């Protein structure tokens, strides 16, 4: 037995020596190995961390911790269970609002002509919301960075079910990202808005008895900051930005390169989810297929220069009988001619953007070539923003007062859009719009844009501090509808109707301002960009559906509620909760319905229809019986003066 075991051991040792390298071989192999430093593996770069966010029927899971904090703070677990789809809509919408800090909107616009920048996100948030974004950092690094994108099924998709519905979140650790992009964290609740107004000369005439709005009960500081508009023109917007790129080439094609896809069709399709929105982006991601189906696969061989079809053969079969009566088949292969390359279907590209020099040349053709310093005398500064400063100015030789916006043209990020809006404002004039008067370009950089000036300030001050009756509300709505009817007739959608953008003159004039969100659409067509201010926003925009001019009608109805209650619905809620409530409830509650006339209630009902196809238009509303109650505009004068005196 021992002899057998020792024999087996010797055999194993012998076989091991045969198949094992000798020491010399090992030394030789070690010499051929590269140095350890050359084999070092570098650290990963441009990594993307994917997190799947789902809803298990009880709560959302997988959200980065900053988003979980904001979700639990603003929306209770009961509300999350009640309507998880509305929570998803609110998260996606709120995430997009973190795109970039709010910038001055005056004369910085989404072009009302065809422009690839129109599909970016332009939703306003309060200054406090965006200011906190710079100061908050995520403790979990890139994996839970608020640059995480939250994606879910669109509003038209199936309802969420347990375990089967996921959002796709991603965060990038690219070191080239700016701090503002890395630190877009959901912000704390905004602070209450101020009710202060600039002081004007004391009014000494007899003022009729007013109905001041009763003070609000003490509330936690959750109100967004309203803009302080001392005059007509200083308002704000975010400047949209887009990235350009080209679709992948068609496989097997040697044709001309496909031109870049228009940016309003281009997306970052890094996930298979139906959308991909992030705190850095305020636009919905739409899946666009870039590949073309060519039927059969074509392979080429370079040895003989012949082209062969990989899935098709043309052959002639010939049957030949042999001596034994068996039949053999000889296949004679006929080489087909080279296949014709399928034509590449190219989308019609938009016109190329103008260069800065071309914009400057066109601007010189529009502006007044003379020197404005001899015509306008600057009196005081009434507004300042990222794009420029607004002044009140007197016109030399007259008593006219105008608003002058002065901008450093060379530093404007969207020069062509600025040029386009000047062209549009010059073309479309109406008594109920804050109209463009003229413009100047001094030393090829100092751009002056002269506009109407309304000393009465905006409607917000009046509706917050006083209480208008139905006749006065009808008068304001009638003037706004005249302006909207004019814009809609020219296929222009305002997209940001609210009391902040309605300016009042000391003689009772009512004018719409802030054309920064305007967009021109072809008759019958719709848009799907997300723009406006959330509290006044229509459900179809919030749910990122296609929309048309009916969005202005919804916002007008919300502004009517604002004149009744002193604030729009959900203003006391945090932005995320407000978006959730709009998505869940649709039509807001009319708190004082019992106190309103039947005509006013019917007017509100026609404006606040969730289905835009059933919503009234300007023609129908201008003929509505409620507007027959409109008082003369002079009835607004005592209220405007009283507010300006405080």
From Swiss-Prot:
EC top class, as a word: transferase
Entry EC number(s): 2.7.11.1
Ranges in coiled-coil conformation: none
Residues the record marks as active site: 496 (proton acceptor)
Biased composition (Low complexity): 142-157, 167-180, 229-245, 273-307, 323-334
Protein kinase domain mapped to chain residues: 376-627
Positions annotated to bind ATP: 382-390, 405
GO biological process: cell migration; cellular response to starvation; gonad morphogenesis; gonadal mesoderm development; inductive cell migration; intracellular signal transduction; JNK cascade; motor neuron axon guidance
Subcellular location: Perikaryon; Cell projection, Dendrite; Cytoplasm
A GO term for molecular function: ATP binding
Alphabetical list of SMART domains matching this protein: PBD, S_TKc
Pfam families: PBD, Pkinase
Biased composition (Basic and acidic residues): 22-33
Segments for region (Disordered): 19-40, 136-345
CRIB domain: residues covered: 41-54
Subunit structure and binding partners: Interacts with mlk-1; the interaction is independent of max-2 and mlk-1 kinase activities. Interacts with mig-2 (GTP-bound form).
Protein name: Serine/threonine-protein kinase max-2
């Amino acid at each position: 037995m021992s002899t057998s075991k020792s024999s087996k051991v010797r055999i194993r040792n012998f076989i091991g020596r045969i198949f094992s390298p000798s020491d010399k071989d090992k030394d030789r192999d070690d010499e051929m190995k590269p140095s350890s430093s050359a084999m070092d593996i570098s650290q990963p770069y441009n990594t993307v961390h994917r997190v799947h966010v789902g809803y298990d029927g009880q709560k959302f899971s997988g959200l980065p911790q900053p988003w979980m904090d904001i979700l639990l703070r603003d929306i209770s677990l009961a509300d999350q269970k009640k309507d998880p789809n509305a929570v998803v809509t609110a998260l996606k919408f709120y995430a997009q609002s973190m795109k970039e800090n709010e910038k001055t909107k005056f004369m910085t616009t989404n072009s009302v002509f065809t422009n690839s920048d129109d599909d970016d996100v332009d939703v306003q948030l309060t200054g406090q919301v965006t200011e906190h974004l710079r100061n908050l950092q995520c403790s979990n690094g890139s994996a839970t960075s608020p640059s995480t994108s939250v994606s879910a099924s669109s509003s038209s998709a199936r309802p969420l079910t347990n375990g089967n519905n996921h959002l796709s979140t991603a965060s990038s650790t690219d070191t080239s990202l700016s701090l503002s992009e890395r630190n877009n964290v959901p912000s704390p609740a905004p602070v209450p808005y101020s009710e202060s107004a600039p002081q004007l000369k004391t009014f000494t005439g007899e003022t009729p008895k007013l109905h001041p709005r009763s003070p609000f009960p003490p509330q936690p500081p959750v109100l967004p900051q309203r803009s302080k508009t001392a005059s007509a023109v200083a308002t704000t917007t975010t400047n949209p930005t887009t990235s350009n790129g080209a679709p992948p080439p068609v496989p097997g094609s040697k044709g001309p390169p496909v031109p870049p896809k228009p940016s309003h069709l281009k997306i970052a399709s890094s996930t298979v989810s139906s959308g991909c929105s992030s705190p850095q982006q305020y636009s919905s991601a739409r899946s666009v297929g870039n590949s073309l189906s060519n039927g059969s696969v074509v392979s080429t061989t370079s040895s003989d220069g012949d082209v062969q079809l990989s899935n098709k053969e043309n052959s002639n079969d010939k049957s030949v009988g042999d001596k034994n009566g068996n039949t053999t088949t000889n296949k004679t292969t006929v080489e087909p001619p080279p296949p014709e390359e399928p034509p590449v279907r190219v989308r019609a590209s938009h016109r190329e953007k103008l260069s800065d020099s071309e914009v400057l040349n066109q601007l010189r053709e529009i502006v007044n070539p003379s020197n404005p310093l001899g015509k306008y005398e600057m009196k005081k500064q009434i507004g300042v923003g990222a794009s420029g400063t607004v002044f009140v100015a007197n016109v030399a030789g007259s008593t006219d007062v105008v608003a002058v916006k002065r901008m450093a043209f060379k530093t404007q990020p969207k020069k062509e859009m600025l040029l386009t809006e000047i062209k549009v404002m010059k073309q479309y004039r109406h008594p109920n719009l804050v109209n463009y008067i003229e413009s100047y370009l001094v030393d090829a950089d100092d751009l002056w844009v002269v506009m109407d000036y309304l000393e009465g300030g905006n409607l917000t001050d009046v509706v917050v501090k006083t209480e208008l009756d139905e006749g006065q509300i009808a008068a304001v709505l009638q003037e706004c509808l005249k302006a909207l009817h004019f814009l809609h007739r020219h296929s222009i959608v305002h997209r940001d109707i609210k009391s902040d953008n309605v300016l009042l003159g000391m003689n009772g004039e009512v004018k719409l301002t802030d054309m920064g969100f305007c967009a021109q659409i072809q008759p019958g067509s719709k848009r799907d960009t997300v723009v406006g201010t959330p509290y006044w926003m229509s459900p179809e925009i919030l749910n990122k559906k296609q929309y048309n001019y009916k969005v202005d009608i919804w916002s007008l109805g919300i502004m009517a509620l604002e004149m009744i209650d002193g604030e729009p619905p959900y203003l006391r809620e945090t932005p995320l909760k407000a978006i959730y409530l709009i998505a869940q409830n649709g039509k807001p509650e009319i708190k004082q319905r019992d106190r309103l006339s039947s005509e006013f209630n019917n007017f509100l009902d026609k404006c606040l229809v969730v289905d835009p196809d059933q919503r009234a238009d300007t023609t129908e509303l201008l003929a509505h019986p409620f507007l027959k109650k409109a008082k003369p505009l002079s009835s607004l004068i005592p209220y405007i003066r009283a507010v300006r005196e405080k």
